[in-house]
Amino acid sequence: MKFILLCLDYLDYYARLMLPYLAVFIPLYLLARGCWILRRGQPMEFRHELKLGLLALYALFVLAVTVLPEISLSRGIRFSYAEGSFGPHNAGIQLIPGNFLRYLGFSLKYLGGGALVALIGNLCLFAPMGFLAQRCFGGAWWQYLLAGAGISLGIELFQLLLPRATDIDDLIFNALGMLGGYFLGRGYARLAGRRGHALPKKVKGDG
């Protein structure tokens, strides 16, 4: 129960963190996307635009979780983790794959599971992005593995400039999460295709 509450606390923190950015991002995105559609002179495909919009919003969420500063009237602008700590892991540079697992037991015993939240979060963080990107653009699995690793590498390198930890394990789990999201997207497409084939075809002249 404590672990679930901790997960909810982190989600609540990052949801509130996004609010100032959403107020700026949504109008700019709609304006830019509208101009792009008008310039192309082609009819808008609502479902495709909806998926693109969700992908853009989720990309903003990833940035809010990883690199964007907290903006609030009471605290001003600051770069930090959510309230709490992941323990000894929560600092510096870590370049040994699998080293993060050493802190799971310590975190579960003394810190309420913060490290486990981070591990699951790193694995799941890129999964929705992989799913939405697959639904928007398709592509091969290795492209998503490389994209996940590349995006995560950029984030980890940028975090060298911030009071946050830079960890090779984050990159690994982010890339695997992106790949997992890709396969979820493919699975969804296949299920939707089978469902479409299973529906009875409309007889010409009906209705």
Language-model segments: residues:
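Non-cytosolic membrane-interface motifs at loop->transmembrane helix junctions
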Residues: 78, 165-176
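Bulky hydrophobic segments
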Residues: 1-164, 182-207
